[in-house]
């Protein structure tokens, strides 16, 4: 059975009875086919029994929680079953060594830049960011790398804006709260992508709290933020572009809140449905010579990072060809 992500938008109760997990809400009680669940995303107010959590942990199923506004709150991360002390040592060494850390930080951003270029080409704009990549290669500090990344994104959003409908202009990238509909859509998709990357990291031997571009902090899986630099343009931005240009997402799917604009419940439902479909879409992998899902591409990227950390093969970021 092919496993899929489960999204819970309504309020309810998640509990275990014998060897079955049930979700109960105002519409009734429904058993969940646990063997077909990859991970769970909870947007409603959901109570969970300890027995259900124990069972989900045994099955290696991560749960990701989002607040009332659709932003990521945190994860229930089952005990890791894939351990490698050797990899942990190498992962930390690459953080502590300034040159090794800087190399990886640059590669994550270069991957993101090239995927932004590819998006613009698909949006009918042939702009190249080669001058930024040259500048990036000359950076000697992480803060300098982040500065270049910020300027590239500002230019990218400006160029992307030229192709967007009048009702869905970015104008200026704003967050928490986003100031218009397009900013709200981009932020919501980025917030959904981040825990999807966390799930993939859980299924590798990597330690998700040790990162290179983003500074490791308590209470966040910062390695997922590193990898998101590559996948935000490839998955979140491209999906946002399609949703507004095809009229799938409209003004009616948003609400004014907290001095900003947010997706309403119906808008969240529509976006999440399309996001899950997007993650399950397959592309023909040029090197593997077979079809892989976009979700799987994230796992493969993590495996490439493992090979770099243990000295098997230098990491090269994924650049979209599809």
UniProtKB/Swiss-Prot annotation:
Cofactor: Mg(2+); Mn(2+)
Molecular function terms from GO: DNA binding; DNA endonuclease activity; metal ion binding
Binding site for Mn(2+): 149, 214, 229
Superkingdom of origin organism: Archaea
EC number: 3.1.-.-
UniProt cross-references to InterPro entries, sorted A to Z: CRISPR-assoc_Cas1, CRISPR-assoc_Cas1_C, CRISPR-assoc_Cas1_HMARI/TNEAP, CRISPR-assoc_Cas1_N
Class of enzymatic activity (EC top level): hydrolase
Keywords in alphabetical order: Antiviral defense, DNA-binding, Endonuclease, Hydrolase, Magnesium, Manganese, Metal-binding, Nuclease
UniProt keyword Manganese, yes or no: yes
Database matches in Pfam families: Cas_Cas1
Keyword Metal-binding: yes
GO BP: any one term: defense response to virus
Its job: CRISPR (clustered regularly interspaced short palindromic repeat), is an adaptive immune system that provides protection against mobile genetic elements (viruses, transposable elements and conjugative plasmids). CRISPR clusters contain spacers, sequences complementary to antecedent mobile elements, and target invading nucleic acids. CRISPR clusters are transcribed and processed into CRISPR RNA (crRNA). Acts as a dsDNA endonuclease. Involved in the integration of spacer DNA into the CRISPR cassette.
NCBIfam families in alphabetical order: cas1, cas1_HMARI
Quaternary organization: Homodimer, forms a heterotetramer with a Cas2 homodimer.
HAMAP family: Cas1
PANTHER family listed in its UniProt record: CRISPR-ASSOCIATED ENDONUCLEASE CAS1
Family (UniProt): Belongs to the CRISPR-associated endonuclease Cas1 family.
Name of this chain's protein: CRISPR-associated endonuclease Cas1
Provenance organism: Methanocaldococcus jannaschii (strain ATCC 43067 / DSM 2661 / JAL-1 / JCM 10045 / NBRC 100440) (Methanococcus jannaschii)
Gene name linked to the record: cas1
């Amino acid at each position: 059975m092919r496993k899929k992500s489960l999204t819970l938008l309504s309020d309810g109760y998640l509990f275990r009875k014998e060897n079955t997990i049930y979700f109960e809400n105002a519409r009734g009680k429904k058993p969940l086919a646990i063997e077909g669940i990859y991970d769970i995303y909870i947007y409603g107010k959901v109570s969970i029994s300890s027995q259900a959590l124990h069972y989900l942990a045994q099955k290696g199923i991560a749960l990701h929680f989002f607040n009332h506004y659709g932003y990521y709150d945190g994860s229930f991360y089952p005990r890791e079953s894939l351990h490698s002390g050797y990899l942990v040592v190498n992962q930390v060494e690459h953080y502590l060594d300034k040159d090794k850390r800087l190399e990886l930080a640059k590669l994550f951003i270069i991957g993101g830049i090239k995927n932004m270029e590819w998006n613009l080409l698909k949006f009918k704009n042939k702009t190249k960011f080669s001058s930024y990549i040259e500048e990036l290669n000359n950076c000697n500090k992480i803060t300098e790398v982040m500065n270049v990344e910020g300027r590239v994104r500002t230019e990218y959003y400006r160029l992307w804006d030229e192709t967007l409908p009048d009702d869905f202009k970015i104008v200026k990238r704003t967050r928490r709260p986003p100031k218009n509909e397009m900013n709200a859509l981009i932020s919501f998709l980025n917030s959904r992508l981040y825990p999807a990357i966390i799930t993939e990291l859980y299924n590798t031997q990597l330690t998700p709290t040790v990162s290179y571009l983003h500074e490791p902090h308590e209470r966040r899986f910062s390695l997922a933020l590193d990898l998101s630099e590559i996948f935000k343009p490839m998955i979140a931005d491209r999906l946002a572009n399609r949703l507004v240009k095809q009229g799938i997402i409209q003004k009616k799917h948003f609400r004014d809140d907290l001095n900003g604009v947010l997706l309403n419940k119906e808008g969240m439902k529509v976006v999440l449905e399309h996001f899950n479909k997007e993650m399950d879409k397959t592309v023909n992998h040029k090197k593997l010579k077979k079809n892989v899902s976009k979700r799987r591409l994230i796992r493969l990227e993590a495996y490439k990072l493992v090979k770099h950390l243990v000295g098997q093969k230098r990491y090269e970021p994924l650049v979209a060809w599809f």
